Structure formats: structure tokens, C-alpha cells
Amino acid sequence: MEERSMQKAGFLKEPIKHIGITKHNVVPMVEEMADMAFQARNLARAAFIVDLMQKDKECAVILTLAGSLISAGLKQVIIDMLEHNMVDVIVSTGANIVDQDFFEALGFKHWKGSQFVDDSELRELAIDRIYDTYIDEDELRVCDDTIAIIANSMQPGAYSSREFIVEMGKYIEEKGLDKNSIVYKAYEKGVPIFCPAFSDCSAGFGLVHHQWHNPDQHVSIDSVKDFRELTKIKIENDKTGIFMIGGGVPKNFTQDIVVAAEVLGYENVSMHTYAVQITVADERDGALSGSTLKEASSWGKVDTVYEQMVFAEATVAMPLIAGYAYHKRNWEGRPARNFNAMLDAKPVNA
């Protein structure tokens, strides 16, 4: 056992560090990129549009997160955006929020690794690999167990993922855990986080454990309630902008709230006024992740005046785009919407 621990420690030596957006003023570089070509020009235009979302004080900004972003070092970018009131709603995969951000709030880390490795050896040592990044599987099990503990502490019933993630924020506060966390900062700021596929991550393991041992009275996650709550935000704040990192469920879920509002009788609801997506997916296979924002306009989801696709990897493009908007400082004077308070005051009944 001691030999195994030493072998494992040999792999888990250098932690991933999170880059922020407040330190380096990237505005001059991004503005010069506007006169280049290809994805440099697209990135610059995307940065201008994200900045327009900050200038437009009527616009509620929705940030969507897909892909392995927090483990890759983007946590501080998102925390900086939350801290400076640049984001009003987050829609994410469960992995980013639970397996990665909440995991780090528990005191654990992600580690620099290599894609050129014997994966069978990693398996023997209980090390999980995300391309060139390592995670301690034994620590992930602690995260799973913590989700079960939180569920066990709640009144049985159906909750939106947003409501459950608020409880995760409370847990961080009550247990004196690391508050440099997306979950905690959003909890503190009243910014709702939705994970429409919440069970597809460590939350799923924790919740299935909770329900298995509490078959008659237990907590469950109502994804339709997620959809209704997010649609209610669109109805209450008609002008919206979406900054999408990756695609997947968070992208489609967020685009669909325009159509959902129409289905509920709000026929004059506006399409998303502003839209930016960073992706490496291809539009030619017809899948959602690479579908263009112009395509989304045919579905009545996204206006085409201020939209931009950036075909780039998120760890490169997101800090530049978010950093540009931060250093333009048009977020100053944006109203704090605190949609959590709005949803809790006017609950969407399960």
C-alpha cells in the first residue's frame, strides 16, 4: 500500500494553476487581432460582442459551460466574471460544477499529466486522465460521498439543479471550505447555476447512493423545473446575451428558452440579442455542438445582428475574450440581478 501511494504521488506532483483575467490588459492585442484573419478576427469580434453585453445594462448575460474547463485552469476566469458582475446566469455540465469546481472547494486539485502514458498503470493507481490532466479517483469518491451527505440533509422532494447547487454553496460556507469557488461565488452573488444533465457527473453517483438508501423518501432532481426556471428568467428579463463555451446540453438548453417562452404564450419574447460561441466542433455533421448561430436563427432562438462563432480551443480563447470585456470595464454600473432571489421569491412549483 505504501509503495502504491509513492507511485501515485510520482504522478500527482504539479497542480494545474488557474489563470485570471484581472492582471493582464489584453485589450490592445485583441483590438489588433481584429485586423488579422481567420479565427483571430473572429475572436476579436466575439470579444467586442461580449463587451456589448456588458454595455447594454438591460441585457442579462448567460454563460454556458461544456467540456472539461475547470480542470484545465479556467476556474478563476469564471470567478472573476462573477465577482465583477459580468454574468447573471450559468448553465453548465455537471462535471464542471461538481467534479471539478466543488471538488477543488473540498481541498483537492487537478494535476499536470501527459497524454503519452500507460493508462492501465493509471487505472491500477486510481488516477483518472483528462487528456494531459490527472485526477485522483479516491478524492473524486469523497466528492461523490459529499453530494450524498448534502442530499441526506435536505427535505425529501423534487428540486431543480439550481436549488441543489445553492445547498452546495451553503455547505462550502458552513464547513469553512475553499470559497474561491464558482459554486460559492455564485451562491454569494445570487447567480443561478443550472446543470440540466445533473446526474451525468459526481452528483449522479452521490444522488443514486442517497436514493438507494432512501427509497421511499428522497431528494430528486427535476430537469423540467430547471427548464421552467430558466425560461422564467427569460420572461422576466427579455433582453439576453449568451456566451457559450463549448456546446452540448448547456448550449441547446439555453437557446431553447426562447421557444419555451413562446410555447407558454409569451409570443413577443425576443430572440437572444447577443450570442458568442467558442467551439472546436464541426457544423457539417449536423450535431448541436458545432451548429452555427446563424442556423439557430432559423429556429427563432438567436438574432443574427450580434452573433459570432469562434472555432478555437476554450483554454486559449476564453481568457482573451473575457479579459477584453473585463478591461474595457463596461461591466461597471451593471445592475446585480440576483435571479436566485427572484426565483425563490416567486417559486416555480415542482
From Swiss-Prot:
The EC number(s) this enzyme carries: 2.5.-.-
Q: Name one GO molecular function term.
A: deoxyhypusine synthase activity
**What GO cellular component entries does it have?**
cytoplasm
Question: Entry's HAMAP family?
Answer: DHS_like
Mind listing the UniProt keywords for this protein, alphabetically?
Transferase
Family membership noted in the UniProt record: Belongs to the deoxyhypusine synthase family.
Q: Which Gene3D superfamilies match?
A: Deoxyhypusine synthase
Task: Output this protein's name.
Answer: Deoxyhypusine synthase-like protein
- A single Pfam family it belongs to is DS
What taxonomic lineage is listed for the species of origin? Bacteria, Pseudomonadati, Chlorobiota, Chlorobiia, Chlorobiales
Q: Which organism is it from?
A: Chlorobaculum tepidum (strain ATCC 49652 / DSM 12025 / NBRC 103806 / TLS) (Chlorobium tepidum)
Domain of life the protein comes from: Bacteria
